[in-house]
Amino acid sequence: MGARLKEVYSTEIAPALVKRLQLKNVMEVPRVEKVVLNMGLGEAIQNIKVLESAVEELTRICGQKPVVTKAKKSIAQFKLREGMPIGCMVTLRRDKAYEFLDRLINVALPRVRDFKGVSKKGFDGRGNYTLGIREQLIFPEIDLEKVDKVKGLNVTIVTTAKNDEEGYALMEAIGMPFPKKAQD
């Protein structure tokens, strides 16, 4: 059985986007290529246990083991040397990407305190969308007793859209909770 959001995308969202974006066929419709989750941890320089807990939490959130990212350059002011572990990231593709987006939109984001919608300014000019999450506690997979420190993460949704308008149309159709125009 495939991801629920992927089935909805192929049966309802894609045909609707063909009409909305005035495309010639369904293969031109923008789609989600991958979802990248990144946790940058500056504290990992002093305390390696912070990194271990972040890796464990990211594994629980997306069901895939993250890769530990290392510093590319040495920066003396930050007491950082090249090759030191400073974060972790996961790349989700195909069904796992759609399953994660489904959980993010329908379960995690509604749990954010005082949530009014996600920013429309997260597009990069090429149709990709980046979203910052301030605390990992919004995901139901995280056990609150085991959390030692609140950590944020970045979620980048890479699409096949050619520009921001197509990317916005795709994100809106998938169900990304952008604020309504009256509040702008």
UniProtKB/Swiss-Prot annotation:
Q: In its keyword annotation, does this UniProt entry include Ribonucleoprotein?
A: yes
What the record says about family reads: Belongs to the universal ribosomal protein uL5 family.
Q: Which GO terms describe its cellular component?
A: ribonucleoprotein complex; ribosome
Recorded hits in Pfam families, A to Z, give:
Ribosomal_L5 (PF00281), Ribosomal_L5_C (PF00673)
Cite the record's note on assembly: Part of the 50S ribosomal subunit; part of the 5S rRNA/L5/L18/L25 subcomplex. Contacts the 5S rRNA and the P site tRNA. Forms a bridge to the 30S subunit in the 70S ribosome.
GO:BP terms for this protein? translation
Listed GO MF terms = rRNA binding; structural constituent of ribosome; tRNA binding
**InterPro entries the record matches:** Ribosomal_uL5, Ribosomal_uL5_bac-type, Ribosomal_uL5_C, Ribosomal_uL5_CS, Ribosomal_uL5_dom_sf, Ribosomal_uL5_N
Could you tell me the keywords of this UniProt record? Ribonucleoprotein, Ribosomal protein, RNA-binding, rRNA-binding, tRNA-binding
Q: Which PROSITE patterns is this protein grouped with?
A: RIBOSOMAL_L5
**What does the protein in this record do?**
This is one of the proteins that bind and probably mediate the attachment of the 5S RNA into the large ribosomal subunit, where it forms part of the central protuberance. In the 70S ribosome it contacts protein S13 of the 30S subunit (bridge B1b), connecting the 2 subunits; this bridge is implicated in subunit movement. Contacts the P site tRNA; the 5S rRNA and some of its associated proteins might help stabilize positioning of ribosome-bound tRNAs.
This protein's name: Large ribosomal subunit protein uL5
